[in-house]
Regions:
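Short, surface-exposed coil-to-beta transition loops
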Residues: 86, 101-107
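Short solvent-exposed beta->alpha transition segments
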Residues: 37-67
Length: 135
């Protein structure tokens, strides 16, 4: 499979807008980029948009200053018509309970069909995140 990759297109911008909305606890504001039946794979869990919106928003109850840094985004346009936007990032936040700052690396992709995101994959090691929430 081959194709081409770009970093300054509408789909890469949509990924960045989604991640900014997450950081601002406003994922609902970008719902229009997703298909009605979008499925999110968060590590090994499959979720709907509404479940992701609720779950990601709940993280703001435990952490302040949620940020993405070291972000790298690009969209792959494959010759077979598939389109994926890839996003590598460093997630950081400060625990509201312990005031500890935690940092973790993550990777996400959007799969596009008809200019809508139909599938999302997001992978990260949740160990430190879960430990801070349990404190």
């Amino acid at each position: 499979m081959s194709g081409y990759m770009v970093g300054n297109d509408d789909k890469s911008d949509a990924m960045l807008n989604f991640t900014k909305a997450y950081q601002n606890n406003d994922i609902g504001s970008v719902k229009s980029i997703f298909s009605e039946n979008v499925i999110f794979h968060i590590n090994d869990t499959d979720l709907t948009f509404d479940e992701v919106n609720e779950g990601f928003s709940a993280g703001h109850n435990f952490f302040d200053n949620i940020k993405h840094s070291d972000a790298d985004v690009s969209t792959m346009y494959y010759n077979d018509g598939q389109i994926f936007t890839n996003y590598w990032y460093t997630w950081s936040a400060v625990s509201k309970k312990t005031n500890n700052k935690i940092t973790l690396k993550g990777y996400c992709w959007f799969k596009w069909e008809n200019d809508k995101v139909v599938e999302v994959y997001n992978a990260f090691d949740p160990t430190a995140y879960i430990a801070e929430m349990a404190n």
